[in-house]
Amino acid sequence: MTHPDQKPWILGLTGGIGSGKSAAAQCFIDLGIDTVDADHAARWVVEPGRPALEQIATHFGNGVLQASGALDRGALRKLIFENPEQRRWLEALLHPLINQEIVSHLAKAKSPYAILVSPLLIESGQSRMVQRLLVIDVPQQVQIERTMLRDSSSQEQVEAILKVQIQREDRLRHADDVLVNDRDHAWLNSEVERLHHFYLTLRGGQS
């Protein structure tokens, strides 16, 4: 990890599906903190006209493209979900490109610290970009219930996703800070504000 005086100082924010990463990130944004979402970077690198999209279509066939030429994420997700080897191929293509996008956007941060939000922060090696790691955590049953409600998914579908994500215990082992997000939004907001002031202290009290 780099020294806290280095600019920009980056906080990594991660958590499993249904943990409330996006809600926590929004609380930081409301406090004026610049945030880069790895999921957004992942969408940018496969936009029409980008080289990665052409490589994906060549590898998987035009069945992964919509009529407009945009990526059909559902079709691609189905292909890689059923084939770990194909998923690894896709990750090897996209992860370096996604990381380049992330680094470029983080370098533009103007706030006292910046946040990288990523569901794959640990698995992808993106944790090497950050100085501190915050895990948003909830019990697994809460993850399942929230995701079923949000995505209209079955319990079996959510459990299948959980199986391919890093185990909760492993994620927590990497954490510098843990925010257990199993209460209401007002409580989440107060916890984020508490952590925000702590991170400002780590940055030497800049505001």
Curated annotation (Swiss-Prot):
* Catalysed reaction equations from the record: 3'-dephospho-CoA + ATP = ADP + CoA + H(+)
Residues annotated as domain DPCK: 10-207
Name the Gene Ontology molecular function terms of this record: ATP binding; dephospho-CoA kinase activity
Name its pathway. Answer: Cofactor biosynthesis; coenzyme A biosynthesis; CoA from (R)-pantothenate: step 5/5
Q: Name one Pfam family in it.
A: CoaE
For this protein, the Enzyme Commission number is 2.7.1.24
Q: According to its UniProt entry, what is the function of this protein?
A: Catalyzes the phosphorylation of the 3'-hydroxyl group of dephosphocoenzyme A to form coenzyme A.
- Per its UniProt record, what NCBIfam families does this chain match? dephospho-CoA kinase
Protein's UniProt name: Dephospho-CoA kinase
User: What organism is listed for this UniProt entry?
Assistant: Pseudomonas syringae pv. tomato (strain ATCC BAA-871 / DC3000)
Ranked from the top, the taxonomy reads:
Bacteria, Pseudomonadati, Pseudomonadota, Gammaproteobacteria, Pseudomonadales
Gene symbol here is coaE
